Every structure is written in C-alpha cells, then in structure tokens.
Amino acid sequence: MRELPEISQDINRVDSAIRELFLLRMSLALEVAKTKAQSDDKIYKPDREAEIVEKRSAGMEEELQLKYVSLLQSMIRASREYQYSEILRQTPEKFPFYP
C-alpha cells in the first residue's frame, strides 16, 4: 500500500493537469463566443449540453457518474457564463438594459 504523501503528490499532479485543461477549455469557450457573436448564434443550447453530458458520462460506475455529471454541468455552466460575458463585452448594444 502506498504512503499518504505519495498519494497526495499524485493528487496534486492531477489537480494541476485539471487546472491546465480547464484554462484550455475556457480559452476555447472564448473562441466559441467570438464566433457565435459574429454569426448571431445562440450561446445556450440545452440539447447540445445534454448530449455532451450524456456522451461523456456514459459507461461510468453510477456513483462516480453522478459526481462527474455534476462536475461537467458546472464546467459547462462556467463556459456558458464566460461566453455571455465575452459577447456582452464585444456587443454591448445588444444589451441596452445593461448599464
């Protein structure tokens, strides 16, 4: 059995990798927002989001699947909010109610 410090180091490495992947995902979300702003495409696409969650979580053990779905939904929501803020920044005239 491995010692706790060794396991903790592995967790730290995984957390660092997750951080880098999250930053990459948000960078891609920003790219998506810019493209959608130019084409007047909608940010929120519930069917697409549901499809992503379903495909990515398929085949997982049930308890872990529930936790992963929660994590994935949170990440998708953060990406969507980031896209909205970018579109607001790019095209404030589309949001006349925004101060």
Task: Go through each PLM region and give its residues.
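Domain-level signature for soluble enzymes in the chorismate/prephenate branch of the shikimate pathway
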Residues: M1-P99
